[in-house]
Amino acid sequence: WKDDIKIDQEAVKAYVGGEFKPNAGAHAGRDWGKFDIEAEVVGLCPTGCMTYESGTLSIDNKNCTRCMHCINTMPRALKIGDERGASILVGAKAPVLDGAQMGSLLIPFIAAEEPFDEVKEVIENIWEWWMEEGKNRERLGETMKRVGFQKLLEVTGTKAVPQHVSEPRHNPYIFFKEEEVPGGWSRDISDYRKRHMR
C-alpha cells in the first residue's frame, strides 16, 4: 500500500486494556503477562516512527518502512491503506553453492490494477535493456552489477529514492550528474566549505 496506515484508536485502547489478544491470539497457549504497547509495538518499530502518548497511538507514515510488525501485533487496530499495489524487485537468484540472494528493489510502488499495463511497461523496458546490455547466459542481476544499477533506474525512468539503498554509507551506486548539483562541478569549493564548517 502507498497511503497511510489506518488507526482505530478505540481498538488500540482495547488492546492496551486487555480486551483483545495481541497477535490475534497466536500466543494464547501461555500467560505472557499484560500487553505492553510500548515494549511490544512502539519499541520494536525499526524506524521509530510510532509514538504512544496519553492513550493515543500515532504513526509518522513518511518514515514507516511498512515492515507490518505493528499490524501483525494489533490487526484489529491497524489496517493497511486503501491505495494498494506492488513493489518490483529484480536480480534475485538461488544458486546451490551461495544460497538464495534477494533481488534489488527497483520500483517501490506501482499500481497493480487490471490490465496491468504499468507493470508490463516496466518489465518490457527491463527486457529490452537486458537483451541489449546482457552477455550470453548472463542473468539480470549479474548485468546490473556489471553495468550498474543506476543505468537500470534510468532505463525504467525510475527516480532514485532512499529505499534503493541496501547498505547506507557503503559504496553508493547512485551518482549525481552535473545538472543535478546546484552550481555544477565548477562551483567554488572553499565557499561551500565556509557554509558547512564544523
From Swiss-Prot:
GO molecular function, one term: oxidoreductase activity
Positions contributing to [4Fe-4S] cluster binding: 45, 64, 67, 70
The keyword Nucleus belongs to this UniProt entry's keyword annotation: no
SUPFAM superfamilies registered for this protein in UniProt: Nitrite and sulphite reductase 4Fe-4S domain-like (SSF56014)
A matching Pfam family: NIR_SIR
4Fe-4S ferredoxin-type domain mapped to chain residues: 55-83
Keywords per UniProt: 4Fe-4S, Iron, Iron-sulfur, Metal-binding
Function field: Part of the complex that catalyzes the reduction of sulfite to sulfide. The alpha and beta subunits may have arisen by gene duplication. They both bind 2 iron-sulfur clusters, but the alpha subunit seems to be catalytically inactive, due to substitutions along the putative substrate access channel, and because it binds sirohydrochlorin (the dematallated form of siroheme) instead of siroheme.
Self-association state and partner proteins as the record states: Heterohexamer of two alpha, two beta and two gamma subunits.
Protein name, per record: Sulfite reductase, dissimilatory-type subunit alpha
Species of provenance: Megalodesulfovibrio gigas (strain ATCC 19364 / DSM 1382 / NCIMB 9332 / VKM B-1759) (Desulfovibrio gigas)
Upper taxonomic lineage: Bacteria, Pseudomonadati, Thermodesulfobacteriota, Desulfovibrionia, Desulfovibrionales
